[in-house]
């Protein structure tokens, strides 16, 4: 067997962008080989199929997203501030001319009618993210309340990621967050924002 001359992570980073922009169905093997510089045989040997490559890309994206949540929580003065900063970052990202939303949410939307393994995988990653928020919120609230707040937060995140495609939506999103997540303003005594 020939030694592979590529790094799996580099390939995944390239295809994350491609799949994220185009979606699963609209991305061809030709586009993938052009973006990665690899031949189809190398891709199939490493990932078994286009579906396997897509799932590996989703997993890498989810890992980055989860790491970003933990980093934000670790660097903020409170869970309140971390959540606010993350929501503001999502809104800022939506202002970009090359805005792509969330890869996991876009996958859910694209593949919802099929309910296939990729859809289920994306859903599982989003559930995992919700549980991470739940764990952090549970430090401040009783479990039942924290669970409701984590679900509310995910609903707002989904909304930001989708509504972000609307031009000039940042002010509307900020006002909506304040209306939908009033508990966020009272979570921390040291919040001055």
Question: Can you describe what each PLM-predicted range is?
Answer:
Residues 11-19, 90, 157:
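Short hydrophobic clusters on alpha-helical segments that form packing/core surfaces
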Residues 114-141, 151, 178-182:
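Amphipathic alpha-helical packing segments from all-alpha helical-bundle domains
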Residues 106-109, 144-163, 176-183:
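Hydrophobic alpha-helical segments that form the core
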Residues 59-65:
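Short, basic, alpha-helical segments at the C-terminal edge of helix-turn-helix-like DNA-binding modules
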Residues 96-117:
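Amphipathic alpha-helical segments used for helix-helix packing
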Residues 56, 70-96, 149-153:
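Hydrophobic alpha-helical connector segments
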Residues 93, 113, 154-172, 183-191:
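Amphipathic C-terminal alpha-helical segment
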Residues 4, 10, 18-52, 56:
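Helix-turn-helix
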């Amino acid at each position: 067997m020939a030694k592979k001359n590529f790094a799996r992570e580099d390939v995944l980073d390239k295809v994350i962008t491609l799949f994220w922009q185009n979606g699963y169905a609209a991305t061809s093997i030709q586009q993938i080989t052009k973006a990665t510089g690899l031949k189809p045989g190398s891709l199939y040997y490493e990932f078994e199929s286009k579906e396997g490559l897509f799932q590996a890309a989703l997993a890498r994206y989810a890992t980055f997203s989860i790491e970003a949540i933990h980093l934000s929580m670790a660097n903020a003065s409170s869970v309140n501030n971390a959540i606010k900063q993350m929501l503001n970052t999502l809104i800022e990202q939506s202002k970009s001319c090359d805005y792509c939303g969330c890869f996991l949410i876009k996958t859910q939307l694209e593949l919802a009618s099929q309910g296939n393994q990729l859809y289920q995988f994306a859903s599982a990653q989003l559930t995992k993210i919700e549980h991470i928020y739940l764990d952090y919120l549970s430090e401040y609230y009783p479990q039942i309340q924290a669970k409701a707040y984590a679900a509310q937060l995910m609903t707002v995140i989904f909304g930001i990621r989708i509504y972000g495609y609307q031009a000039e939506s940042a002010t509307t999103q900020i006002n909506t967050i304040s209306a939908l997540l009033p508990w966020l303003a009272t979570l921390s005594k040291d919040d001055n924002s």
